[in-house]
Amino acid sequence: MTYPKIGIRPTIDGRWGGVRESLEAQTMGMATAAKALIEENLHYPDGTPVQCVLSPTTIGGGAEAAKCAEYFAGENVVATLTVTPCWCYGSETFDMDPHTIKAVWGFNGTERPGAVYLAAVMAAYAQKGLPAFSIYGHDVQDMTDKEIPADVAEKILRFAHAAAAVGWMKNKAYVNLGGIAMGIAGSFCNAEMFQKYFGIRAEWVDMTEIVRRITLGIYDHDEFNKALSWVKANCKEGFDCNAGKDLPEIIRKSKVVDPDKDWAFITKMTMIMRDILYGNPKLDEMGWHEEALGKNAIAGGFQGQRNWTDWLPNADFTEAIMASSFDWNGKKAPTPFATENDTLNGVAMMLGTLVSGTAPCFHDVRTYWSPEACQRVTGMAPTGVAKDGFIHLINSGATALDGTGACRNAKGEPCMKPFWEMTDADIKACLNATDWCRANYEYFRGGGFSSHFRFHFPRPLHTVFLFQR
């Protein structure tokens, strides 16, 4: 693929005859330092280091700004970082492309007025209606200081990471597998929102497509055998809440897949949903050319309830493995994949994954426990971080297995890692921390399995919500 790149624009005072010449090395030094900072610290969602493009020349006026823009146009530059230690000619040197994301780093030094250019160019951007981010260091630096201060580095990396995420999602698709689940407002896919705010196309695939592919064998049969063997070896079964229940006939006769064949069916479901999103060259070899293409997805969701789950195994395993940073093929990029096709949750998961590099965990906000309620029910009052009460987030069965926190960082603390840092030991630990319980037939007549695990703490968590009006 052609990766979305960050363009570095070194702007300079254009006065030849001593001024410009004295600034060339420092200005280009800032640009190369920023380029190295980004490329050494940031990754695309597929694990590849983020790529930067350096302007072929410092930019002292409109002619060089145009030359830089022309060069960037052929490099798939989605964002620009303008850097300077000095005064430059505001609107003559700025990035005027309305389609790029912009930031400006003005050097905090006394010898040259980098701050003046930063203020002037930000004013120019505001007057032109072009959003831009201002980056300036807290402390004055010596002109000869080639180090990027920590506070500036953090701002540059935040900007570049978010900009690369925007470039990554552009022109990709959110794939709705099914429609609206149980009247959930978030399941109403707003195609205009996806296009206008995220540059993403919305696509719909009826859930019968999964049945068609299972029936006609439109999946990689060798991979299926590998995947099913992996599932049986690594996905231990937990408790069965249906045991001993006298279930009504309407529930008993609704399960059309034999319980002993649930895992095989679910494994096929998982492979097929992945293939729908991303395509699979193996299908092309099998003669299924259209199916091999996929949907160029960046995220998706599965309706499930109730048109599917009232008679077929649920997709909790599918959703959990899609969102996890590993499967039977080893470590992989996690897929933001929304339970109940809650598209707003799907977008929140996507944004979180793009800027963190880690798997998205889909939880239910189940209860709020006040200190008084804890005291009444358990006889004990919460202490420490929970002393004022806490919100109970529960894994309803479809959360990424990374959410167990079974991975460990260099200090031995529970954590979640970008998939490219996952080890075989991390993967095994997540699998060992999880068991798979039979779905409650009163809710899921078609059966299936739901993940069950306890979180490892302490570790930081970030909660993401998305609302649309």
Language-model-detected regions and their locations in the chain:
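An N-terminal assembly and electron-transfer interface module characteristic of large anaerobic redox
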Residues: 1-469
